[in-house]
């Protein structure tokens, strides 16, 4: 087997409201898939990359649902473990909003994914991939998953694979802020490409500017840092270059969940395609913009054709403004 990239983490069944209002007011829900790492896997698969996702799911119907949905997206799940214990597949409820941030309630404590151990690491499978994508969520789920994350990143790094890391800061999952900051920054030192949001970077480093945040992680060993600035765009820096890329025009923000995953899809795919860091970040901005205009966690993740059409439309807008 040959994979372009592989990732791991917890995917959950998502039940998202069909009506506006608080979760306590809603009567009907639709079912979907949620999970930062699986979002990225699906996004890269839609762009034609051979993707693998590894995890543990419950021996239940929601676990079956997750596997079948990922297979539909073209993501390889051949090494996902079905739990033989009573640990269930995680799930979440998400409200429907007219725009902005929805209310999300998670049910993931003691989930099957949180029990994944280093003894269950399929090294041969991961070594089939040239790139590893990691987020800061798995090490927050349990001591076992924290050890698993360190083990995988060290093994892939020692094998000469490239590693991208999105901190995906979730304070509610960690025992305390100090542990969160230390662990995420420690793991960032094992990555080649690091993708924090500006608020995450400020929290993790104490720096107040994109330049300061980027310098912090370049000194820790990253070769490329891309900092998400929301609707303003993104800033990137390497050892020899830096730049600011304006955000893409968005007609209406429907749901912000998954925007950061879309950015990661764009940047990773761009680098794997051989684009410059600047052009890869611009692609990240574009896919992030597409994602916030769609209701689901990955509904806006495009095919190559849709991405090309969106980028062409963005260039046309800029040309009319005289920006080029």
From Swiss-Prot:
Catalyzed chemical reaction(s): 2-dehydro-3-deoxy-D-gluconate + ATP = 2-dehydro-3-deoxy-6-phospho-D-gluconate + ADP + H(+)
GO molecular function: 2-dehydro-3-deoxygluconokinase activity; ATP binding
Annotated binding of ATP, by residue: 168-170, 228-233, 258-261
Keywords: ATP-binding, Carbohydrate metabolism, Kinase, Nucleotide-binding, Transferase
Record-listed substrate binding positions: 35-39, 106-108, 170, 261, 297
EC number: 2.7.1.45
Induction (UniProt): Induced by galacturonate and negatively regulated by the KdgR repressor. Is subject to catabolite repression by glucose involving the ccpA gene.
Pathway(s) annotated for this protein in UniProt: Carbohydrate acid metabolism; 2-dehydro-3-deoxy-D-gluconate degradation; D-glyceraldehyde 3-phosphate and pyruvate from 2-dehydro-3-deoxy-D-gluconate: step 1/2
PROSITE patterns: PFKB_KINASES_2
Active site: 261 (proton acceptor)
Alphabetical list of Pfam families matching this protein: PfkB
Summary of the function given for this chain in its UniProt record: Catalyzes the phosphorylation of 2-keto-3-deoxygluconate (KDG) to produce 2-keto-3-deoxy-6-phosphogluconate (KDPG).
Family membership: Belongs to the carbohydrate kinase PfkB family.
Name of protein: 2-dehydro-3-deoxygluconokinase
């Amino acid at each position: 087997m040959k994979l372009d990239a592989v990732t791991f983490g917890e995917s959950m069944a998502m039940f998202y409201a069909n009506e506006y209002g608080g979760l306590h007011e809603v009567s009907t829900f639709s079912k979907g898939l949620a999970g930062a790492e699986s979002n990225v896997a699906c996004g890269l698969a839609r762009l034609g990359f051979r993707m693998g996702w590894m995890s543990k799911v419950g021996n239940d119907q929601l676990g079956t649902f997750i596997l079948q949905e990922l297979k539909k997206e073209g993501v390889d799940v051949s090494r996902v473990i079905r739990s033989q214990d009573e640990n269930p597949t995680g799930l979440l409820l998400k409200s429907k909003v007219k725009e902005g941030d929805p209310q999300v309630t998670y049910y993931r404590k003691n989930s099957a994914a949180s029990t994944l151990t280093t003894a269950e690491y399929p090294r041969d499978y991961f070594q089939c991939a040239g790139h590893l994508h990691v987020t800061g969520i798995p090490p927050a789920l349990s001591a076992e998953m924290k050890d698993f994350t360190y083990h995988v990143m060290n093994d892939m790094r020692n094998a000469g694979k490239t590693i991208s890391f999105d901190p995906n800061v979730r304070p509610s999952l960690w025992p305390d802020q100090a542990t969160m900051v230390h662990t995420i920054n420690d793991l960032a030192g094992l990555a080649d490409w690091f993708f924090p949001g500006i608020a995450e970077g400020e929290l993790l480093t104490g720096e107040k500017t994109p330049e300061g945040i980027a310098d912090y992680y370049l000194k820790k060993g990253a070769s490329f840092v891309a900092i998400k600035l929301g609707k303003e765009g993104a800033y990137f820096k390497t050892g020899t270059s830096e730049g600011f890329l304006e955000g893409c025009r968005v007609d209406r923000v429907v749901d912000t969940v998954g925007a950061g995953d879309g950015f990661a899809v764009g940047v990773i795919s761009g680098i794997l395609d051989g684009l410059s860091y600047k052009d890869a970040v611009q692609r990240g901005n574009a896919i992030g913009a597409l994602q916030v205009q769609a209701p689901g966690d990955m509904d806006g993740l495009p095919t190559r054709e849709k991405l090309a059409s969106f980028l062409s439309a963005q260039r046309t807008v800029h040309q009319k403004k005289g920006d080029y």
